[in-house]
Every structure is written in C-alpha cells, then in structure tokens.
Amino acid sequence: MPALHLLFLACLVWGMGARTAQFRKANDRSGRCQYTFTVASPNESSCPREDQAMSAIQDLQRDSSIQHADLESTKARVRSLESLLHQMTLGRVTGTQEAQEGLQGQLGALRRERDQLETQTRDLEAAYNNLLRDKSALEEEKRQLEQENEDLARRLESSSEEVTRLRRGQCPSTQYPSQDMLPGSREVSQWNLDTLAFQELKSELTEVPASQILKENPSGRPRSKEGDKGCGALVWVGEPVTLRTAETIAGKYGVWMRDPKPTHPYTQESTWRIDTVGTEIRQVFEYSQISQFEQGYPSKVHVLPRALESTGAVVYAGSLYFQGAESRTVVRYELDTETVKAEKEIPGAGYHGHFPYAWGGYTDIDLAVDESGLWVIYSTEEAKGAIVLSKLNPANLELERTWETNIRKQSVANAFVICGILYTVSSYSSAHATVNFAYDTKTGTSKTLTIPFTNRYKYSSMIDYNPLERKLFAWDNFNMVTYDIKLLEM
C-alpha cells in the first residue's frame, strides 16, 4: 500500500507541471527487474531532510485518504441514484404497461360493442328488407285475389244468366197435357240449386274447377259417390289442418306417420314422429294416442340401432321402414320388439344427395304406402334422374316389380302413391302449388294434372298418403298437417 501511495505522489508531482521526469529500469542484485521513476522538484533546489520528507508523505497520505473517502461517498451516492433511477424507470414501465393493458381492454370492449351494433344493424336491415319483400308479395297476392274474385263474380253472374236462359228455353209449357205427363208436371221443373249436379254444371259453365265449389261434409272431405272405401283417381286436395308444431330447430323438417295396418299392441291412434335435422338421426318418438301427439307427450322413445336419412320413412304393419344414413339400404325395424328384421339395398339407387327431390335434404329414397302395400320411390343413373317406382315385399324388402317413369325426380317437390298411382307435387315453397303429374302403374302411362295444393307454411319436406284415414300427412316448416282428399272411380 505505501508503494502505491508513493507512485500516486510521483504521478501527482509529474502532472503538476514537472517536465524533467526520468524513467529507468534495471535488475537488482537478486536479478529481479526494478523500475525507477525520477522527478525534479519545481520549487526545491535541494532535497529536504528525511523528517521533512516523511511529513510531506504523511500529508499526502492524509489527502489521499480524504480523497478516497470522498470517492467512496461519491460512488455510494451514484449507486443510490442509479438504484433510484432504475426503480423509477421500472415503475414508469410497469405503469405504462398497466395503462396500455387497460386501454387495450377498453378498446377491445368498444370494438366488440361496435361489432355487435353492426351485426344488430345488419340483422335489422335484413329483417326490414324481408318485411318489405313480404309486404310486396302480400300486396301482389291481395291484388291477384281481388282480381280473381272480380273475375269469379263476373263468371257467376254470367252463369246465372245462362241458367235463367236455359230454364226459359228448355221445357216450354203446352196447352194440352200429354198422356204421359203426370198431374202437376205441366210447369217446368225447378232446379235445386243446392244439388251436387247443379254445382258441377255451374262450374262447367263458368270454367271454374269443380273442386273449388263442391260442398264438403262435416269431416271436411267432399262427398264422393264411391264413399269411403274403394280406389279411384285423385281429383281434389283440401286445405291443410295443423295438428302440431315442432318446438326446436331440429323440427324444421321431419316425418310423422300412423300405421294404416296396425298390429298389436298398436292402434289406429298410434303415432310416430322423427325430427330429421342433423347428421345422426336415431330417435323415434312414439305416441299411444292422438291427444298425446298433439300435446307433445311421447309414451316411448325408440333409439334406432343405425341412423336414418331424410324424411322418407313410413310405418306399415307394425314396422318402421327407413333408409339407412349415407346408403341405398332400406331397413325394416319392428317397433314392438325393437329389432331389425330385414335390410335390403335398392339396386343402383342414388343416395345422399345424388337424386333428391327439388328441396334437397338427401331425399333420394322415399318410401310410401297405399292400399296395396309398400313402395319405394327413387332414381338411378340408368334412368338418368327419372323417377323409378318399385313395389316392395314388406317382410323381406325384395323388389317385386319396378316401373320407370318419365318424370324427373329433381323437378318435383315430393311424391306419394294412392291406389297404385304415383302423384307428384310441383313446389315445396310456393303457397299455391299443384299436384302436377300422375303415373298409373296399371297402364304404365303418365299425365299432367293441375290439382291445387296449399303449402301453408311454405316448406313442405314430407308428404305421404295414409290409406286407412284417406288423408295426406305432411310436414310443412315445423308444422305437422293433414289434407283431406277426394277420389273418383276410374
């Protein structure tokens, strides 16, 4: 440590202006290298005594100690300042980050609120536009109905005049009674304006379809001369009667049915329903009574061993017949024993959107029931999209006979079979659709029809015929409805 003090003193003296410093190095007696630094005093011409030198050295040591203490104090203050600065900087950064996070959170909330407002605005605009379109459509429909009403009134007035003219000119009175004339028959017989014959005559004179003015019986079905039994051609479809409305989005479309040939333990009131929105359709709701069905309280829920596809299922003779999902296989599921009794592929049948009805929904294979039994409606590549109709054996699902029609399956909304005749519906969404084609399996011929058919809820995804009740069952946009029909002998 004293050597360092001497070196410091030498440097200090040299730094104060000494310009005659000498530096020398040489080996001492032991061979070690020694460095010698010589500086001339600027004020003293001769060296002081030894005691004076020691006093000067001590003064220098005291000054050095004081300077060292000042240096250490300065270093401590610098370290304190650096620590304080670091803390201040860290606090400022932390505060800035917290402020930034808070601002970003508020900004995100504002953005979400803005997006919600924009979405609500778009929804309101879309709803408003839909209302405007519906309003325009209703106004147009109202105008058409008013025009039709006026035309009908004019035609009825014209027909009344024609009937009056016929009354006057048909049977002129005679002065002398004929021998074949019964007493009281001299006057012209009066028309009974309430009879079915007069209504049919008036409809012919006014070119109004008879189905629009025929009187109905209390059950809502027009009177037909063949009664409630026997087969005939479809000539009239009534207005839909709504029995039930589905509660959830899964009921947008589906299938509901009653067994036209019920077996124990089921009755004519037993009803089944399947909601077919989704990809894994296995639940079948069973209702023992019609009132349970209308109120929505199933007595049992079947879980099918394999998923079904679309709205083509039917119930016949105690079994549920349906198309297996993503396949051309028809499955017979016995409801009482809850077991699969038969499975059969329909040769070449399109499936899973290959040849559906016009509304889509994977309606490639559609099962149907009429007075003669079980049918399947489909199409094939060989038929080039035309409807193919096959009669099925209900026990083993073997194809008994097949007919290829000239009706394109994708051009019609749905189809059903009555008395061996295939009927198609023109539209699933138009409120005023028609039964537009008929194919007779007895003659192998088809013809066009214009029987009015009402899609009240404008999305009919299923239409089936029940030969026991002589009604059409349909599923129209969440709603399960029935239609009365009229058949005439062929």
UniProtKB/Swiss-Prot annotation:
GO terms for cellular component: cilium; collagen-containing extracellular matrix; cytoplasmic vesicle; endoplasmic reticulum; extracellular exosome; extracellular space; Golgi apparatus; mitochondrial inner membrane. Disulfide bonds join C231-C419. SMART domains: OLF. Expressed in ciliary body, iris, retina, trabecular network and sclera but not in lens or cornea. Also expressed strongly in skeletal muscle and weakly in heart, brain, testis, liver, kidney, thyroid and epididymis. No expression detected in embryo. Expressed in sciatic nerve. It comes from the Eukaryota. Glycans are attached at N43. GO terms for biological process: bone development; clustering of voltage-gated sodium channels; ERBB2-ERBB3 signaling pathway; myelination in peripheral nervous system; negative regulation of cell-matrix adhesion; negative regulation of Rho protein signal transduction; negative regulation of stress fiber assembly; neuron projection development. Ca(2+) binds at D366, N414, A415, I463, D464. Disruption phenotype: Mice lacking Myoc are viable, fertile and show no significant differences in intraocular pressure or clinical signs of glaucoma. They also show a reduction in cortical bone thickness as well as trabecular volume. It is found in: Secreted; Golgi apparatus; Cytoplasmic vesicle; Secreted, Extracellular space. Residues 69-170 form a coiled coil. One of its GO terms (molecular function) is metal ion binding. Its main location: secreted. The record marks Q212, I213 as: Cleavage. Residues 153-165 have a biased composition (Basic and acidic residues). Keywords: Calcium, Cell projection, Cilium, Coiled coil, Cytoplasmic vesicle, Disulfide bond, Endoplasmic reticulum, Extracellular matrix, Glycoprotein, Golgi apparatus, Lipoprotein, Membrane, Metal-binding, Mitochondrion, Mitochondrion inner membrane, Mitochondrion outer membrane, Palmitate, Secreted, Signal. Residues 230-489 form the Olfactomedin-like domain. Residues 1-18 form the signal peptide. It holds the Pfam family OLF. Secreted glycoprotein regulating the activation of different signaling pathways in adjacent cells to control different processes including cell adhesion, cell-matrix adhesion, cytoskeleton organization and cell migration. Promotes substrate adhesion, spreading and formation of focal contacts. Negatively regulates cell-matrix adhesion and stress fiber assembly through Rho protein signal transduction. Modulates the organization of actin cytoskeleton by stimulating the formation of stress fibers through interactions with components of Wnt signaling pathways. Homodimer (via N-terminus). Interacts with OLFM3, FN1, NRCAM, GLDN and NFASC. Interacts (via N-terminus) with MYL2. Interacts with SFRP1, FRZB, FZD7, FZD10, FZD1 and WIF1; regulates Wnt signaling. Interacts with SNTA1; regulates muscle hypertrophy. Interacts with ERBB2 and ERBB3; activates ERBB2-ERBB3 signaling pathway. Interacts with SNCG; affects its secretion and its aggregation. This is Myocilin. It comes from Mus musculus.
